[in-house]
């Protein structure tokens, strides 16, 4: 597995961690890690701006959904 594939897998894992977080702190921690992985992909593997923007937006949406789910007690 290449470094790029490992970073993408770690990014997906953090998205899962955001989605399954039981408290806001855990979701924020996973969000920060996911953003670091996106940054590494951007700088070390020359990911395109559109791809990077989409990945950041995905992280934000996952966090928003997790916070909404937790606030509604679902």
Segments (PLM) and residue ranges:
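N-terminal acidic leader/helix
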Residues: 1-29, 35, 64, 68-69
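Short, charge-rich amphipathic interface segments used for partner binding and complex assembly
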Residues: 29-68
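Short acidic DE-rich linear segments
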Residues: 70-74
């Amino acid at each position: 597995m290449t470094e790029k594939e490992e970073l993408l897998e770690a990014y997906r894992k953090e998205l899962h961690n955001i989605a399954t977080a039981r408290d806001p702190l855990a979701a924020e921690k996973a969000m920060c890690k996911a953003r670091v992985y996106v940054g590494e992909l951007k700088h070390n593997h020359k990911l395109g701006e559109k791809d990077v923007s989409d990945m950041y937006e995905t992280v934000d949406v996952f966090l928003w959904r997790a916070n909404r789910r937790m606030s509604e007690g679902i």
